[in-house]
């Protein structure tokens, strides 16, 4: 009788398999926790309120840099390309792109390269980082190609080559910064949402400075 009662009590107190499975599914994985710690360590938010402010600030900066890149391309390439002699520039060695199409390819390649490099670093994926590095070098080659043609082939004068490469540098830099801000904002939003839904905290503990008063000081020697 005692053994039967003990077995019934153990069966009643034992958790149901479905409840255990649900608890395991709801628990954050070590991969997600490590990724959140990597993001927090890189961006260094002090608390959850600062995470919210950083999301808003980076989203705003991403939009501002993105529209600045578009306006610069519109004025310097789309509208002013003919006056700067873009139609006389030779086609690119890679893809046989004209300068107008090159001004669209460079920001596209830069955008994808920035996303791959950022996600490869945060996730610790070598293939993603490898692909991002390949695209980054390709974008750099397309940007400096006019200067290289001037120095090696001699089919461009100095002013034309510097003007062509300079515009591509500005476009690539603006789109890189805009994409980086956008990805950081999305990652911070993911960290904030995961912390709120999973009730975990990956933020570093704040250490208040220790203020020593005069009472703690040793008396002077007489």
Question: What are the language-model segments listed below?
Answer:
Residues 1-47, 219-222:
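N-terminal, intrinsically disordered, low-complexity segments
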Residues 24-76:
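Cytosolic juxtamembrane helix and N-cap/initiation of the first transmembrane helix
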Residues 56-77, 145-208:
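Alpha-helical membrane-associated segments of multi-pass integral membrane proteins
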Residues 60-64, 83-109, 128-141, 161-171:
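Transmembrane alpha-helix entry/boundary detector in multi-pass membrane proteins
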Residues 104-125:
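Canonical alpha-helical transmembrane segments
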Residues 108-113, 147, 213-218:
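Long, compositionally biased low-complexity segments enriched in polar/charged residues
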Residues 120-145, 202-205, 209-210:
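Cytoplasmic juxtamembrane regions at transmembrane-helix boundaries
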Residues 200-222:
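Low-complexity, proline/glycine- and charge-rich juxtamembrane/linker segments of membrane proteins
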């Amino acid at each position: 009788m005692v053994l039967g009662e003990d077995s019934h009590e153990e069966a009643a107190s034992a958790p149901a398999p479905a409840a255990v499975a649900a608890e395991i599914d709801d628990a954050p994985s070590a991969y997600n926790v490590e990724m959140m710690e990597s993001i927090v360590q890189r961006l260094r938010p002090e608390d959850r309120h600062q995470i919210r402010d950083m999301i808003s600030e980076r989203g705003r900066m991403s939009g501002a840099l993105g529209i600045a890149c578009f306006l610069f391309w519109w004025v310097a390439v789309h509208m002013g390309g003919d006056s700067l002699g873009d139609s006389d520039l030779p086609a690119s060695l890679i893809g046989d792109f004209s300068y107008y199409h090159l001004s669209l390819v460079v920001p596209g390649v830069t955008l994808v390269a920035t996303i791959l490099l950022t996600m490869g670093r945060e996730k610790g994926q070598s293939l993603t980082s490898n692909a991002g590095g390949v695209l980054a070098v390709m974008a750099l080659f397309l940007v400096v190609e006019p200067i290289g043609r001037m120095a090696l082939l001699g089919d461009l004068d100095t002013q034309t080559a510097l003007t062509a490469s300079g515009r591509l540098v500005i476009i690539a830099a603006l789109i890189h910064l805009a994409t980086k801000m956008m990805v950081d904002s999305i990652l911070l939003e993911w960290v904030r949402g995961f912390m709120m839904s999973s009730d975990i905290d990956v933020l570093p503990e704040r250490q208040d400075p220790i203020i020593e008063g005069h009472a703690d000081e040793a008396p002077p020697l007489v």
